[in-house]
Regions:
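Polar, enzyme-active/binding microenvironments
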Residues: 46, 50, 59, 82, ...
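Short helix-capping/linker turns of helical repeat alpha-solenoids
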Residues: 25-27, 57-59, 89-91, 121-123, ...
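Conserved alpha-helical positions within TPR/SEL1-like repeat arrays
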Residues: 1-7, 29-39, 61-71, 93-100, ...
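TPR/TPR-like (Sel1-like) alpha-helical repeat modules
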Residues: 114-122
């Protein structure tokens, strides 16, 4: 709790000191928190160090964030490794991030596979991106179905796009 107070006051060295103490006492989330602190100031090399400590202990969000950090560093193979690991453990946001990675790599088939997987876990952004792909591929029936779902749950982008199609 003290680490969070320092973090909120942007006293990062003090926050890191207290998070480190917590980590040394067996609190894996503390390594994740330090990773987030560095991620938020775009110090990706530092955040990776801390995320890896948590990720190797099975912390799914740390695995996902390692993938995102590597993505930002354009180290796509490393990003893929960590995102696949988190996605294989059914973390919905990892499915979305993996879909984005495959979209950037122009592997639409793999992107769709992970967007579909995330969609089954009700990850809105997966449904939206899958709808866009369906729309771009002239599969309006599936696109409309996804946009209707997004409209029903109040997703603004889904509401806007269904209006464009219909």
């Amino acid at each position: 709790a003290l680490a969070n107070i320092y973090y909120d006051k942007k006293k990062y060295s003090e926050a890191e000191e207290w998070y480190s103490r917590a980590y040394k006492n067996g609190i894996i989330d503390a390594a994740f928190d330090i990773g987030n602190m560095y991620f938020n100031v775009e110090a990706y090399e530092h955040c990776l160090y801390w995320y890896e400590k948590a990720a190797k202990e099975g912390h799914l969000k740390a695995q996902n964030n390692m993938g995102v950090s590597y993505f930002k560093l354009r180290e796509y193979k490393k990003a893929e490794k960590w995102l696949v690991e988190a996605s294989d453990s059914n973390l919905p946001i990892a499915c979305f991030n993996l879909g984005v990675l495959y979209t950037v790599l122009r592997d639409e088939e793999s992107a769709c596979r992970y967007y579909k997987k995330g969609s089954t876990m009700l990850e809105e952004n997966c449904k939206y991106n899958l709808a866009i792909i369906n729309q771009n591929n002239k599969n309006e029936k599936d696109a409309i179905s996804l946009y209707k779902y997004l409209h029903k749950i109040g997703n603004d982008k889904g509401c806007f796009n269904i209006g464009l199609i219909m």
